[in-house]
A protein has these predicted regions:
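Generic alpha-helical secondary structure signal
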Residues: 35, 39, 124, 130, ...
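Amphipathic alpha-helical coiled-coil segments
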Residues: 48, 95, 146, 190-193, ...
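Leu/Val/Ala/Ile-rich N-terminal alpha-helices, chiefly Sec-type signal peptides and the beginnings
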Residues: 1-81, 85
Length: 212
């Protein structure tokens, strides 16, 4: 169907989050209630997906993927961690802004769905479906893990900032055992969260491919 076809286009383009998505949600093959409903669903999907990709681009621009880069941290340590502190501050701002946008967009979309010029049966189906998908959506699950990841990053930075360490054989060598144990425990938790994120992405890809 047209809806699945357009969904596939959005999904495929979304895989490259570095480039804005370009999909026309209108299609001459659609008419009546189904046309209005399909265009609304696709527009909502497109806005959400593009907002997510913009959020990822914003994080990349802040060098967030290099947060635990040992060479960067060794250099920044000499500057009292000014770069890392600013990075964390900026990342928190991006994450909080994205969270607010997601919530606002969802509320607006449900309100708009209730006013669509389609039969009441379709309207009820659409709003119920949107409310149900809100919590199970891949981006929602991923974002929750990313928020947990940021909290761990705050904690691991405090361990680095408040204790003596140096780079040795490309690893963080602490002068005392307690901070080393703290660092290792937090690092394992971050790796576990990253692994969960990859699993969610793989599972979602599988689900979408099966649907299409």
């Amino acid at each position: 169907t047209v809806l699945y076809e357009k969904t596939e286009q959005i999904y495929k383009q979304a895989q490259d989050w570095t480039t804005p998505i370009r999909v026309d949600v209108k299609d001459p093959r659609l008419t009546g209630d189904y046309q209005i409903m399909a265009e609304f669903v696709l527009s909502h999907m497109l806005q959400n997906t593009e907002a997510r990709n913009q959020y990822l681009r914003d994080l990349k621009a802040l060098n967030w993927d290099q947060f635990l880069n040992i060479d960067r941290l060794s250099k920044d340590k000499k500057n009292n961690y000014a770069e890392t502190e600013q990075m964390l501050k900026n990342v928190h701002a991006v994450v909080e802004s994205y969270a607010q946008q997601v919530e606002q967009r969802q509320k607006e979309a449900i309100a708009q769905a209730k006013d669509l010029a389609i039969s009441s049966r379709f309207r009820h189906q659409l709003t119920d479906s949107m409310k149900a998908s809100e919590k199970s959506h891949e981006a929602t699950r991923l974002f929750s893990l990313e928020q947990q990841n940021l909290a761990k990053a705050d904690q691991i930075f405090l361990v680095l900032k408040n204790n003596q360490w140096e780079k040795k054989n490309n690893t963080f060598m602490f002068y005392e055992d307690a901070p080393l144990q703290q660092f290792n425990a937090l690092y394992k938790e971050i790796l576990a969260l990253n692994s969960q994120m990859q699993q969610v992405e793989k599972q979602t890809q599988k689900e979408v491919e099966q649907k299409l």
